[in-house]
A protein has these predicted regions:
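Gly/serine-rich nucleotide phosphate-binding loop at the start of the catalytic core
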Residues: 1-77
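Short coil-to-beta-strand transition motifs
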Residues: 5-8, 143, 177
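Generic detection of short hydrophobic beta-strand segments and adjacent strand-loop junctions
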Residues: 7-11, 133-136, 200-202
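Long, hydrophobic, amphipathic alpha-helical segments used as structural scaffolds
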Residues: 36-43, 88, 92-99, 166
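Substrate-contacting helices/loops that form the catalytic groove of nucleic-acid
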Residues: 41-66, 147, 153-257
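Acidic carboxylate diad motif detector
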Residues: 53-153
Length: 257
């Protein structure tokens, strides 16, 4: 049996690599929004949309009158078209809403499928158009690499997810036995209690982290730029990064617990 697995690692790009990542993120967002704008016109007229291959064939012509698109990874631009095609397929199959325009605020990411260039070694990873990038991760995919997704989180930290295929033995279903069953019940002054008498208390670090984020958000609301329509000052952006990092810290605490 073949399974898709992924390794997510934080990366530390230098100034030049960081610039290239930000450029690719912006160009992929531009392609996605431009294709969505064109597909919206087609949908209003004929209730259909351009498929992936039709959108992909438009890219070479766009690069002729928009030469700055050549700065980005070509595979990443194609994958932006593929994402939009998937979104429209979900919409027409009534499993999702109408696709929305991408914004430069919040989490951003792009995916590259050039597997001939993608390489993972201990403490470094090689990506198309970027070269080798430092990472604290020592795990190496033990299968064939499918694609890599580079993301910029709201706390200004860069990550890459390497998706690969791995062949594993077939899973044998386990038949539950009475002696292997554990019952859980609600505990009013804690988290839970099990059928063996073991109890677990509610972790207090989560509430403490939430209170810290509330204080940071209160300071953010007093900075110039917190009101709608105001220009975002440098102090506002600095405080916003602190809030985002605290939110990421809380999410990691919940995930680890």
């Amino acid at each position: 049996m073949i399974l898709n697995r992924a390794i997510r690692m934080r990366i530390y790009p230098d100034d030049e690599q960081r610039h290239k990542i930000n450029v690719t993120l912006g160009h992929c967002r531009y392609i996605y929004n431009k294709m969505l704008e064109r597909n919206t016109v087609i949908y209003k007229r004929r209730k259909e949309h351009l498929n992936y291959y039709a959108m992909q064939n438009l890219l070479p012509e766009m690069k002729k009158y928009l030469p700055w698109l050549k700065e980005a990874d070509s595979q990443a631009l194609k994958h932006a078209c593929r994402q939009l095609n998937t979104a429209f397929d979900r919409f027409f199959h009534k499993t999702g809403g109408y696709p929305k325009f991408h914004t430069k605020h919040g989490k951003q990411s792009y995916t590259t499928t050039n597997t001939k260039v993608i390489c993972v070694e201990s403490h470094r990873v090689k990506l198309p158009c970027l070269g080798w990038i430092r990472t604290p991760e020592t795990r190496i995919p033990d299968g064939s690499i499918c694609y890599a997704t580079v993301s910029l989180e709201t706390d200004d930290r860069y990550y890459v997810s390497i998706t690969y295929k791995k062949e594993v033995p077939d899973i044998t279903p386990v038949v539950p036995k009475p002696e292997n069953v554990l019952g859980l019940d609600y505990k009013s002054d804690g988290l839970y209690t099990d059928s063996n008498g073991h109890t677990e208390d509610i972790p207090h670090f989560y509430r403490e982290a939430q209170r810290k984020r509330t204080k940071l958000q209160r300071r953010l609301s007093k900075k110039h730029g917190s009101r709608k329509g105001e220009h975002k000052s440098m102090n506002f952006m600095k405080q916003l990064r602190k809030v985002n990092r605290q939110s990421t810290h809380i999410a990691n605490q919940r995930r680890d617990y």
